[in-house]
């Protein structure tokens, strides 16, 4: 006992001495486990997670596989998003670069074009000496209308000008099929009284005519005239289109020999359709009797043909088939009027089987005591007719034994003759 107490007594002072020897600002090291709060929390979460994981009724390898798949899906989504963003940025950058180089605002284009045009005009004006009030004419491209070959000769013995229309070539195509139906009108200016025209050649751009026309003109008067050769495209359903024309001043031609030459067609001046007047007549057909009755009722606003500003009109009626005149009738002459009233009836025998093959041609003429009676205008109904004329003929056939009256606009004689010459 004594020895133990003595032992304790001996051991105590050194402990006190050690404690006193430590500096006052030194902290005593923490006991193990006292400063590991974070590690404990992580351990607890880990234990809970493992406990929850153990509760899932799946083997560990299955859970690992699911985790790997989930990670792969997440990585794939991230990759796609990144790629899409990069692609958009690339396109945007490319678009900006392209826009900066090529895409120009329309307003900028207009302004730039206007500025450049104004500057160019100023430069041109400065070079040519044009003022602001003057305009510089731009050179127009010459339109190719084809060419025509013709011949000219003069018969001094009979005082006749002989005009030959030989052929045309390289005409422009005016029809939808890539061709034209050309014919040529020939007349002398300034009177335009006597007009000729060639036959219509179907579906060709290089027609060969080989036709000759004669004008009775004294040589002393020939020098003041101009020959016009106008090439037209025939159209059954509308006005004929002019392709081009060529004019020859007679005072420039040497009639000491026959002239034959090719010349390029030139653009023709558009002339307004001359108003020739209107005529009213009725048609009546009786199929059982084979009788066709035409009643010429009246005409109005006829073209002035005489010097006094009037005319002496009368009407000719022709029954035609296949270009041949089968019968001819005519009205009385009405003196000094442009609005004659006739009310004259004419009958023709036409069998029922022939009624669809015939034509009634109505021509209004101006009577002249001295010279030839000039045609004012013309119209025809029946086979190969069109428009109002075809409608009138159809109405007559649809209403047998009943007279059908209708007004018709007179057409130039040469145009109607051209239509009559066309065979279907």
UniProtKB/Swiss-Prot annotation:
Q: Where is this region: Disordered?
A: 117-142
Q: Where is the lipid attached (S-palmitoyl cysteine)?
A: 77-78, 80, 82, 85
The cross-references to SMART domains, in alphabetical order and at most eight, read: C2
Ordered alphabetically, the record's keywords are: Calcium, Cytoplasm, Cytoplasmic vesicle, Differentiation, Glycoprotein, Lipoprotein, Membrane, Metal-binding, Palmitate, Repeat, Synapse, Transmembrane, Transmembrane helix
- The residues that cross the membrane are 61-82
Q: How does it sit in the membrane?
A: Single-pass membrane protein
Q: Name the PROSITE patterns on file.
A: C2
| Residue sites binding Ca(2+) 2 per the record | 174-175, 233, 235, 241
Q: Which residues lie on this side of the membrane: Vesicular?
A: 1-60
CDD domains this protein is in?
C2A_Synaptotagmin-1-5-6-9-10 (cd08385), C2B_Synaptotagmin-1 (cd08402), Syt1_N (cd21963)
Annotated residues that bind Ca(2+) 1 are located at 175, 181, 233-235
Q: Which residues form a coiled coil?
A: none
Q: Which residues form the C2 domain?
A: 144-263, 275-408
| Role played | Calcium sensor that participates in triggering neurotransmitter release at the synapse. May have a regulatory role in the membrane interactions during trafficking of synaptic vesicles at the active zone of the synapse. It binds acidic phospholipids with a specificity that requires the presence of both an acidic head group and a diacyl backbone. May play a role in dendrite formation by melanocytes.
Entry note about domains: The first C2 domain mediates Ca(2+)-dependent phospholipid binding. The second C2 domain mediates interaction with SV2A and probably with STN2.
Q: What is this protein's name?
A: Synaptotagmin-1
What is the originating organism of this protein?
Gallus gallus
